[in-house]
């Protein structure tokens, strides 16, 4: 079933694009319930030193959950902006005190965002540096050392490519990083991927643009084309954020990310905030995003091995009186470990303090009814 749009401009763009329905008509998007068996845990709260937090990441490695994010003193991407992180040794129930991972002592560069990857049983963290908010300068690589439990700097590459998801492994053994590219020290509005032909993280990566620029067929432009992938057999499907037009977009590649078709409109109503997607160990795909602005964070599940999404739940919906959280929950990232899917995201304190943010995790068993 196609979506109903509130503006003629949105409706016009959809008519100009190829379209696929991937969400079943039977899914009651407006009245999704809470996912069965869930638990919520605050990973880190705002502090006097760092009132602002955003763009979290999470991964499971050797039985430990690793989380990371960027902080700023008071406003988004202003002032001292480091990458910090925490670990959980009990499946996300409790978290260690935040630790510093990467920063610029001179204060000239901003660090944002972090992503994780595992290669040859080694954990890596990758992050960007910026000369100002979302003006990309470099891509940095860090490797985790279990002997001292720290991430160590490996190298910096002058690649103005903004990261968005953890490292993906392709069926051909190569690695994929979805994101967006810019000119050096400029704003990235062109969707693209990086590919590691060697299948190694600490190796050269090459750029493939998904489209030549950020223009859409109706003359509007992609602003923050944040990407997230589902990889099944020979098909890569990438969901793309679309700010100016509330038309959900995706791109597809059948040759390992070398060439792309799209944009294609679809009917999962995620558009103007970050989307995260992946595949569970049981073969079901999932996609997570914000509904109704950012006051709802929801997840949809597919049938195994397909892009037919037949069930969905809310991860968060509205004001939380227990935690006193204003309803803005956004920028999800997820990983599966020990039979659970762990979803980390930005949380926000009450509306009167819109720039005060922390990180939260919702975990639930993949044996729940929707995930089986």
List PLM regions with ranges.
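Asp-box/BNR beta-propeller blade signature and adjacent active/binding-site loops
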Residues: 1-372
């Amino acid at each position: 079933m196609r979506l109903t749009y509130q503006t003629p401009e949105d409706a016009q763009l959809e008519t100009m694009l190829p379209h696929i329905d991937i969400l079943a008509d039977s899914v009651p998007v407006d009245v999704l319930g809470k996912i069965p068996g869930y638990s919520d845990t605050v990973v880190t709260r705002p502090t006097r030193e760092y009132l602002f937090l955003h763009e979290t990441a999470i991964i499971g490695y050797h039985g430990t959950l690793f989380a990371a994010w960027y902080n700023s003193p008071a406003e988004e991407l202003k002032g001292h902006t480091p990458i910090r992180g925490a670990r959980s040794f009990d499946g996300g129930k409790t978290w260690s005190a935040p630790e510093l991972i990467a920063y610029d002592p001179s204060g000239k560069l901003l660090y944002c965002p972090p992503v994780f990857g595992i290669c040859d049983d080694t954990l890596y963290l990758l992050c960007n540096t910026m000369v100002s908010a979302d003006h990309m300068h470099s891509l940095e690589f860090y490797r985790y050392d279990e002997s001292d439990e720290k991430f160590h700097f490996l190298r910096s590459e002058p690649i103005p490519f903004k990261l968005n998801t953890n490292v993906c492994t392709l069926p051909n053994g190569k690695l994929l990083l979805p994101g967006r590219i810019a000119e050096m020290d400029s704003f990235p509005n062109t969707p693209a991927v990086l590919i590691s032909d060697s299948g190694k993280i600490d190796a050269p990566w090459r750029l493939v643009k998904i489209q030549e620029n950020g223009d859409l067929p109706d003359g509007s432009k992609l602003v923050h084309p944040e990407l997230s992938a589902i990889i099944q057999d020979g098909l890569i499907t990438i969901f793309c954020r679309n700010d100016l037009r509330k038309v959900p977009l995706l791109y597809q590649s059948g040759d390992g990310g070398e060439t792309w078709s799209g944009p294609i409109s679809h009917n999962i109503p995620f558009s103007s905030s970050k989307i995260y997607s992946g595949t569970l160990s049981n073969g079901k795909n999932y996609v997570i995003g914000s509904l109704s602005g950012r006051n709802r964070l929801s997840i949809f599940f597919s049938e195994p091995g397909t892009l037919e999404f037949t069930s969905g739940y809310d991860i968060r919906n509205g004001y939380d009186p227990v935690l006193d959280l204003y309803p803005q929950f956004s920028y999800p990232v997820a990983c599966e470990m020990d039979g659970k899917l762990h979803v980390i995201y930005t949380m926000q304190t009450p509306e009167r303090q819109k720039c005060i943010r922390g990180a939260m995790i919702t975990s639930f068993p993949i044996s729940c009814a929707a995930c089986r």
